[in-house]
Swiss-Prot record:
Species: Bos taurus (Bovine)
GST C-terminal domain: residues covered: 88-216
GO annotations of cellular component type: cytoplasm; nucleus
EF-1-gamma C-terminal domain boundaries: 279-440
Modification sites for N-acetylalanine: A2
Protein name: Elongation factor 1-gamma
GST N-terminal domain location: 2-87
Cross-link (Glycyl lysine isopeptide (Lys-Gly) (interchain with G-Cter in SUMO1)): K256
GO MF term list: translation elongation factor activity
Modification N6-malonyllysine occurs at: K437
Gene3D superfamilies: 1.20.1050.10, Glutaredoxin, Translation elongation factor EF1B, gamma chain, conserved domain
Subunit structure: EF-1 is composed of four subunits: alpha, beta, delta, and gamma.
Length: 440
């Protein structure tokens, strides 16, 4: 029987999979999710942690015998028993099928729809509507499968049920209001059956289903961003002007003493995003630019793209300090399933994480399964491609063709508008918009 420690951050739905599986199998799993034992964004970046888990990702599991494994599905499998994994080769294959389905088909649209309502991702109306329809399709697929079944595989709970329930959890809690979910009675029955099992309740507690579909809250999104010092300082400076000089001085001293407070207000995920390691700035050799990228990103995240963010972009764009580029994936014939194509974009963005302060991009997947393409518009600091400035940034860029754009041309104006808004004819592509991702 497995026994060990699970490193994660609080309320991580991916960690729930292993914890529920352990409730069924009897595996002894200790959870470290809060300081001083585990500080997400700090502990998982230490040399000691990275020696055990090179990716630095959580959840991560360390067995009492020294065995280490990361990735939530692998951990859940490890702490499970034969019954959860599938007691026959056929059942085991079906369990893997549903676990894979959850990651490939449910996670992308669920994230696109739910994350903006939680204030952790930019909202795009068209993308959200597409995600809603995809979720509707998925719930319908599950509903048909569960019409004559109590559980996804066999007659008892397996890892298939645990994984799919955890993947659907935030949908049911945040956006699947009664009028939306009522069309899927079999899926609802199965979901409620699972979450009310003692083993699920021991981990999830009482799950309250959504009563009213949550909407994107621009204020919540702005507050959730790690870069929020500037607005606070501006607000503070306006308030300071209204105070007498002596009182302002006293207030400044109090603020200095309370310097750590803003970081304490961030949740664990935000602290990880904010905790960038100190390194030499590859763009330090460039002259100062009048274009403030962070301000544009705030406009893009919190205001209407077409009427506010785009006019701001062109009004403030510094053509000497920044450059625009069009990229296109070189090997469209290798693109098969759209979720896999989307993962190419996500993976590239993750590997370019330290470039975010000096770049912005909208990359779009066009088309359908086995007939798709990837292209995007990028805004880089400087006049050359940024990738050669750091070996960390050179993994993916050679898989794309790059063409520098003329900021003053009509073609560039159209490309920027269509790619930043995720709306338009996209005549140069010849395929319909599927989904997009923003690098910011």
């Amino acid at each position: 029987m497995a026994a060990g420690t699970l490193y994660t951050y609080p309320e991580n739905w991916r960690a729930f999979k292993a914890l529920i599986a352990a409730q069924y199998s009897g595996a002894q799993v200790r959870v470290l999710s809060a300081p001083p034992h585990f500080h997400f964004g700090q502990t998982n970046r230490t040399p000691e942690f990275l020696r055990k888990f090179p990716a630095g990702k959580v959840p991560a599991f360390e067995g009492d015998d020294g065995f280490c494994v990361f990735e939530s599905n692998a951990i859940a499998y490890y702490v499970s028993n034969e019954e959860l994994r599938g007691s026959t080769p056929e059942a085991a294959a079906q369990v893997v099928q549903w676990v894979s389905f959850a990651d490939s088909d449910i996670v992308p649209p669920a994230s696109t729809w739910v994350f903006p309502t939680l204030g952790i991702m930019h909202h795009n109306k068209q993308a959200t509507e597409n995600a809603k329809e995809e979720v509707r399709r998925i719930l319908g697929l599950l509903d048909a499968h569960l019409k004559t079944r109590t559980f996804l595989v066999g007659e008892r709970v397996t890892l298939a049920d645990i994984t799919v329930v955890c993947t659907l959890l935030w949908l049911y809690k945040q956006v699947l209001e009664p009028s939306f979910r009522q069309a899927f009675p079999n899926t609802n029955r199965w979901f409620l059956t699972c979450i009310n099992q003692p083993q699920f309740r021991a981990v999830l507690g009482e799950v309250k289903l959504c009563e009213k579909m949550a909407q994107f809250d621009a204020k919540k999104f702005a507050e959730s961003q790690p870069k929020k010092d500037t607005p606070r300082k501006e607000k503070g400076s306006r308030e300071e002007k209204l105070k007498p000089q002596a009182e302002r001085k006293e207030g400044k001293e109090e603020k200095k003493a309370a310097a750590p407070a803003p970081e304490e207000e961030l949740d664990e995920c935000e602290q990880a995003l904010a905790a960038e390691p100190k390194a030499k700035d590859p763009f330090a050799h460039l002259p100062k630019s009048t274009f403030v990228l962070d301000e544009f990103k705030r406009k893009y995240s919190n205001e209407d793209t077409l009427s506010v963010a785009l006019p701001y972009f062109w009004d403030h764009f510094d053509k000497d300090g920044w450059s625009l580029w069009y990229s296109e994936y070189r090997f469209p014939e290798e693109l098969t399933q759209t979720f896999m194509s989307c993962n190419l974009i996500t993976g590239m963005f993750q590997r370019l994480d330290k470039l975010r302060k000096n770049a912005f991009a909208s990359v779009i997947l066009f088309g359908t399964n086995n007939s798709s393409s990837i292209s995007g518009v990028w805004d880089f600091r400087g006049q050359e491609l940024a990738f050669p400035l750091s070996p960390d940034w050179q993994v993916d860029y050679e898989s794309y063709t790059w063409r520098k754009l003329d900021p003053g041309s009509e073609e560039t104006q159209t490309l920027v508008r269509e790619y930043f808004c995720w709306e338009g004819a996209f005549q140069h592509v010849g395929k319909a918009f599927n989904q997009g991702k923003i690098f910011k």
